[in-house]
Amino acid sequence: MAASGKLSTSRLPPLPTIREIIKLFRLQAAKQLSQNFLLDLRLTDKIVRKAGNLTNAYVYEVGPGPGGITRSILNADVTELLVVEKDTRFIPGLQMLSDAAPGKLRIVHGDVLTFKVEKAFSESLKRPWEDDPPNVHIIGNLPFSVSTPLIIKWLENISCRDGPFVYGRTQMTLTFQKEVAERLAANTGSKQRSRLSVMAQYLCNVRHIFTIPGQAFVPKPEVDVGVVHFTPLVQPKIEQPFKLVEKVVQNVFQFRRKYCHRGLGEELKRRKNKNEEKEEDDAENYRL
């Protein structure tokens, strides 16, 4: 579980507010990219506190946008903050933050879905999987359009211990639509229990730590936003390959709850038929 960290007294020098940055660089949220800006630094500070104690930490922030959470992370006295931003419009504002925190903020123009974060930090930060989590964190206010595919990608990385998890059990603090956040953290028997619940919880300790009202964002989304914290488990709850677990779970949840056994039955039947066909082929090859 994440410790409750305190923001450092070593803070950034006076800077324009995020709202002023948006006006200065004439930034507008791109609807096609599901962008929503979080301008209230009290909320961005809260997200950072819930990530744990970031003093001297190495942080990978995804989708920094105009830099609200970025400021809060830098104010937490991290050793290094790496931000990956796809939208070039935000780079000048982020560069202003970099100039205010010399040597601490590294800006990469790229796509979080393809960026190789396993090569971003020093090898010396790596810790054995069985140890406590490394001093590496992932934090992000994710655009709704990429949040689900990105967390599925990272869950697969956890199962393989690659990507951001080459450093060990890297913790993540991320935003999702409230409904998605509730599904990720839903307990067994909950009406919110879903494919995402199983996929996340068989690999991680998942906590929906708080909810941010939609009106806190600009532009205001139609839904509230949930902040979710993930800590990879030392031992997964299901000892099977990720793709197999994913396929079985997809089949289970493709039917309504009371009929979900049908999905599991169909997947088991399919796998049985496949095994029988393989056995027949092997027998035929042996006779030849």
Regions found by a protein language model. Name each.
Residues 1-251:
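Catalytic cores of RNA-modifying enzymes
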Residues 223-226, 230-234, 238-287:
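An accessory alpha-helical subdomain
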